[in-house]
From Swiss-Prot:
It comes from the Eukaryota. Cu cation binds at residues 37, 87, 90, 95. Keywords: Chloroplast, Copper, Electron transport, Membrane, Metal-binding, Plastid, Thylakoid, Transport. The crystal structure with reduced Cu(1+) has also been determined. InterPro entries: BlueCu_1, BlueCu_1_BS, Copper_blue_Plastocyanin, Cupredoxin, Plastocyanin. It is found in: Plastid, Chloroplast thylakoid membrane. It comes from Dryopteris crassirhizoma. Its cofactor is Cu(2+). This is Plastocyanin. It is a peripheral membrane protein.
Length: 102
């Protein structure tokens, strides 16, 4: 599955912002435009340690951003469920999406 991160006019969005994949299927996030963004999965309160570890591994470091030098990032989640992801610098601008793993 592929997700575009941002756009040419600087909107803080993921396109699409809702994705459904099979367990273990990679999602490729690719930067569009020049504004730096990242992808971080929200770890649900009370999530088992294995799920928390998996979501942390599927996330970029909060201090890293996609750029022209590194324009894409692949994430994989194997545990079925619905997970929220967001861009750390633009979280307050509601730049988020959901990944459903079947």
């Amino acid at each position: 599955a592929k997700v575009e991160v941002g756009d040419e006019v600087g909107n803080f969005k993921f396109y699409p912002d809702s994705i459904t994949v099979s367990a273990g299927e990679a999602v490729e996030f690719t930067l569009v435009g020049e504004t730096g963004h990242n992808i971080v999965f929200d770890i649900p309160a009370g999530a088992p340690g294995t799920v928390a570890s998996e979501l942390k591994a599927a996330s970029m470091d909060e201090n890293d951003l996609l750029s022209e030098d590194e324009p894409s990032f692949k994430a994989k989640v194997s545990t079925p469920g619905t997970y929220t992801f967001y861009c750390t610098p633009h979280k307050s601008a509601n730049m988020k999406g959901t990944l459903t793993v079947k």
